[in-house]
């Protein structure tokens, strides 16, 4: 997973968290060590509506560890659960989103103006914050 690259680069331990507990083996949702003193940065490649992130955060909460924030490469901008993160005072940091991608695609003429408008209209109709 993407988190492994971050952990290796920063020389920090990595813990793997599943969306749900395994039905076999140790029957655990968390693989690796996680203690009450630990500070956790949840690192993922994508964030759609944040639903799976909430499951991960619940597992981290149950372990007693502290959640420092969520880092994703691409945020789709579906804001269904965004306010839950804000309410829990958890920062969501992302490298890019639809707005950035469309801006670069337009500036570099990868997409025509009309094509960018079509995508933006679609995103607006889907209530996706770009």
Tell what function each PLM region has.
Residues 33-75:
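A contiguous pocket-lining binding segment that forms or flanks enzyme active sites
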Residues 18, 44, 96:
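Short beta->alpha connector loops at strand-helix junctions that form conserved
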Residues 58-130:
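PRPP-dependent phosphoribosyltransferase catalytic core
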Residues 1-3, 78-79:
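Short, well-ordered alpha-helical microsegments
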Residues 2-40, 49-54:
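Short, glycine/charge-rich flexible loops or terminal/linker lids adjacent to PRPP-binding catalytic cores
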